[in-house]
Amino acid sequence: MDIADQTFVKKVNQKLLLKEILKNSPISRAKLSEMTGLNKSTVSSQVNTLMKESMVFEIGQGQSSGGRRPVMLVFNKKAGYSVGIDVGVDYINGILTDLEGTIVLDQYRHLESNSPEITKDILIDMIHHFITQMPQSPYGLIGIGICVPGLIDKDQKIVFTPNSNWRDIDLKSSIQEKYNVPVFIENEANAGAYGEKVFGAAKNHDNIIYVSISTGIGIGVIINNHLYRGVSGFSGEMGHMTIDFNGPKCSCGNRGCWELYASEKALLKSLQTKEKKLSYQDIINLAHLNDIGTLNALQNFGFYLGIGLTNILNTFNPQAVILRNSIIESHPMVLNSMRSEVSSRVYSQLGNSYELLPSSLGQNAPALGMSSIVIDHFLDMITM
């Protein structure tokens, strides 16, 4: 075996060991050897390298099954920090996490304007805040992940965001040049799907659909544990599937799109009156007070969600559909209405092979997904 091959094998072994330590901390060298199939000298050598790189440290002795007590190893989650930011139509939600995805700092900002220039200024201010407040660590800031609700191409450029009307914006390059760290731009629903897969309701599933219901509707698709982005990177725009070919015109240029009937914007529109302009929080409050008009609107909201979800289930046949929406997460009526509609329409052979679940991460799902994408890249680079 030549030197290049030896180096490659060492890096593969290092990656395998780091993955096991990350998953099973605290763990002994002997247990690592048993779980990976690597011999003890290889484990010892590669663990020493990981310790020199500040990725792993020893925490003392574990229980013995006979003989000397083993020295236990732990993944150093504080070796560096990652920024994940979710840019919505009218908000920015940002987090700073350690290498295990634990949130260390967070910040939420309401957007008075969603112009790209103003949004970028707020983004930079938020990132600066995280950097100045970030704890000391061997690797410092390892990267920044930002998601937006719209079309992202394979070069991670923002092609179009229907509800804030951004077009052809290279946010990645400008942020990367400013901070000199890896930057990742992703679709918001893809980021949410990844967040739920790594940390949330989809942790134990390999094939899931994540549905983000806010001003519009986006879906993130995970097939066999991998994000599916499509040929051009534009998969998941199911909010713009037609459910009424004679319906009203959508901001995307089409007619009768699903999100015109089943988004937060559609729900608000159905309840607005000339006398009073309701906020989304007003609807949540009225629902908890059992206001008849609001409950009827929520029933209808669940009905239209069920129509679209039936199409998604029949198309993808996932193990679970994870739904991110504050009303769905807090009020059972919408979920019940939706489940009823789906069960009456979905392809009968699907039976009980799927679950409809509210998000367990709520508004932090996309930001956590972006932070996790950054961490994955960092851990890959460390063992390259």
Curated annotation (Swiss-Prot):
Q: Which InterPro entries match?
A: ATPase_NBD, ROK, ROK_cs, WH-like_DNA-bd_sf, WH_DNA-bd_sf
Output one GO MF annotation: DNA binding
The lineage's top-level taxon is Bacteria
Q: What keyword terms does UniProt attach to this protein?
A: Carbohydrate metabolism, DNA-binding, Repressor, Transcription, Transcription regulation, Xylose metabolism
Q: Which PROSITE patterns has this protein been placed in?
A: ROK
Q: Which GO terms describe its biological process?
A: D-xylose metabolic process
| Gene3D superfamilies referenced in this protein's UniProt entry, alphabetically | 3.30.420.40, Winged helix-like DNA-binding domain superfamily/Winged helix DNA-binding domain
Q: Name one Pfam family in it.
A: HTH_24
Where exactly are the transmembrane stretches of this chain?
none
Residue numbers of the DNA-binding region are 29-48
**Protein family membership:** Belongs to the ROK (NagC/XylR) family.
Role according to the record: Transcriptional repressor of xylose-utilizing enzymes.
Protein name in the entry: Xylose repressor
What organism is this sequence from?
Answer: Bacillus subtilis (strain 168)
Gene name, per UniProt, is xylR
